[in-house]
Regions:
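Walker A/P-loop
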Residues: 17
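ATP-binding Walker
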Residues: 14
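Loop/turn-to-beta-strand initiation segments
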Residues: 78-83
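Hydrophobic anchor at the beta1->P-loop junction of P-loop NTPases
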Residues: 8
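Conserved phosphate-donor/acceptor-positioning beta-strand/loop module used by diverse small-molecule
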Residues: 97-117
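P-loop (Walker A) phosphate-binding loop of NTP-binding proteins
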Residues: 11
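Small-molecule kinase domains that catalyze NTP-dependent phosphoryl transfer to phosphate-bearing small molecules
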Residues: 91, 119-162
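Conserved substrate/cofactor phosphate-moiety recognition/catalytic segment
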Residues: 21-68
Length: 166
């Protein structure tokens, strides 16, 4: 999709979708990876697995992106810059395709407040919320070596900070 491609990652509630929407509103090419590319699969092989919606840890551990579809999008250089927003557990298969990876960093109070503001979505269920809090503390699913962006700031400042590094 872009001559240069950027991945914006973060834990649930860190602001990925809000950042993506603001980038779109500013005229940038954006792929909502969790909407377009995500499915439940084995993070090593990509083989689809039977979803287990009642098991948040399983859902999280098997939330992966379609690597072949992602590669097609990255190879299409129609736009000067494309931003891919979302999270996946098979990032290790494609992280090297991005010019930079940004990590939206925020505190638990901010994440919790944001999750409260999106009823019916991931993180609304108490078991999901508990898992998100554990992941926030452990940082186990976060990309190592990513460019940290303080996502507690106003949204336009977060987006400006990302664009300043592109």
């Amino acid at each position: 999709m872009g001559e240069r491609n950027f991945l914006i990652e973060g834990i649930s509630g860190s602001g990925k979708t809000s950042v993506a929407t603001m980038l779109e509103n500013r005229g940038f090419d954006v792929i909502h990876g969790d909407r377009l590319l995500a499915y439940q699969g084995d993070p090593q092989t990509g083989v689809p697995v039977m979803p287990r919606p009642q098991d948040p840890a399983f859902v999280n551990a098997h939330h992966i992106w379609d690597v072949d579809q992602l590669k097609r999008l990255i190879d299409d250089q129609t736009h000067p810059r494309t931003f891919f927003c979302g999270a996946s557990r098979n990032r290790h298969h494609f992280a090297q395709w991005f010019d930079a990876i940004f990590l939206l960093e925020t505190d638990w109070a901010t994440i919790s407040r944001r999750l409260d503001g999106r009823p019916g979505e991931w993180g609304d269920d108490p078991r999901e919320r508990s898992l998100i809090q554990q992941l926030h503390i452990s940082r186990i699913d976060l990309p190592i070596g990513a460019i940290a962006i303080d996502a507690t700031r106003p949204l336009h400042e977060v987006v400006d900070a990302i664009l300043a590094r592109c």
